[in-house]
C-alpha cells in the first residue's frame, strides 16, 4: 500500500512538471481543474512541497513556473560585442517572454474547457518564432486543435500565416480556436481566411471563457 502511494505521488509529480514545461505558467486553480479526478489535497500538498524543494518556483501566490531564472533579467542578456550593451533589446526579450508565458496560461484555460467536454489528450507547446501567436495544440475526437491568440492591434500577424498556408496542402482535420480581446475583432479577422477556424474566445483574468462560433 505504501509503495502504491509513493508511486502515485511520483507519477503526479511527473505530470505537474510536464505541464509546467509545456505551458510555462500555470495557476493552482488550473492544476486543480486539470487533476479534478485526483485527490485535490494531494495536488496542493505536492505543489507546496515542490516549491520548498526548488523543483518549481512560485513568483506570486498560486502561480507556478518551472524555473526561477525566467524572472531574472540577466537570463535574457545577449552576447555583447566590444563590451557594448543593448539594454533595450534585452528588456524586450524579457518582457516578451513573460508576455508569452501569460498567453500560454490563457490558452491552457481554453484547453481545460475541452478537457471537461471531451477526451482531450495533453497539450503540446507550439514554439514557433515565425508564428508566436500559435500557443498550444492538442488532439481530441479525431482532430488536431490549435489555440491561437490574436490581441487587438495584432491582427495583421495572420497575413503571413494565410499566405504560407495558401501554398501548402493541409492534411487531416485541423481546428483552430482563436483567443481575442473582444468579439468586435471577429469581422476583421475573417478577411484573412485562416484555415480551420472553429471558434473565437475571450478569456478574462479569472479564467472565465466566452465562446463565439465563426
Give residue ranges: language-model regions:
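Nuclease-adjacent, charged terminal/linker segments that flank catalytic cores
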Residues: 1-86
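Generic detection of long, well-ordered alpha-helical segments
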Residues: 36-40, 100, 104, 179
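Assembly/interface hotspot detector across virion components, adhesins/toxins, and nucleic-acid enzymes
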Residues: 56, 123, 201-203
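Short, flexible beta-strand-to-coil junctions
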Residues: 60, 139-142, 151-152, 180-186
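Hydrophobic residues embedded in beta-strands of well-ordered beta-sheets
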Residues: 63-64, 144, 208-209
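Secondary-structure transition/turn motif
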Residues: 68, 151, 213-214
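Exposed, interaction-prone assembly regions rather than primary DNA-binding/catalytic cores
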Residues: 89-172
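C-terminal regulatory/effector modules of DNA-binding transcriptional regulators
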Residues: 157-214
Amino acid at each position: 500500500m505504501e509503495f502504491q502511494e509513493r508511486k502515485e505521488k511520483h507519477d503526479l509529480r511527473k505530470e505537474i512538471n510536464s505541464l509546467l514545461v509545456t505551458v510555462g505558467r500555470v495557476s493552482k486553480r488550473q492544476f486543480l481543474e486539470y487533476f479534478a479526478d485526483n485527490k485535490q489535497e494531494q495536488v496542493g500538498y505536492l505543489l507546496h512541497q515542490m516549491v520548498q524543494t526548488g523543483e518549481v518556483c512560485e513568483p506570486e501566490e498560486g502561480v507556478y513556473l518551472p524555473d526561477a531564472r525566467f524572472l531574472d533579467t540577466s537570463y535574457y542578456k545577449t552576447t555583447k560585442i566590444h563590451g557594448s550593451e543593448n539594454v533595450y533589446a534585452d528588456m524586450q526579450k524579457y518582457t516578451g517572454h513573460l508576455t508569452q508565458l501569460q498567453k500560454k496560461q490563457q490558452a491552457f484555460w481554453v484547453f481545460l474547457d475541452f478537457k471537461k467536454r471531451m477526451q482531450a489528450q495533453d497539450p503540446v507547446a507550439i514554439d514557433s518564432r515565425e508564428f508566436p501567436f500559435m500557443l498550444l495544440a492538442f488532439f481530441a475526437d479525431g482532430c488536431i486543435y490549435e489555440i491561437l491568440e490574436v490581441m487587438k492591434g495584432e491582427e495583421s500577424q495572420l497575413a503571413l500565416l494565410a499566405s504560407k498556408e495558401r501554398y501548402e496542402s493541409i492534411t487531416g482535420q485541423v481546428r483552430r480556436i482563436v483567443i481575442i480581446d473582444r468579439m468586435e475583432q471577429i469581422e476583421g479577422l475573417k478577411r484573412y481566411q485562416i484555415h480551420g477556424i472553429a471558434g473565437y474566445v475571450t478569456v478574462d483574468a479569472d479564467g472565465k471563457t466566452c465562446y463565439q462560433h465563426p
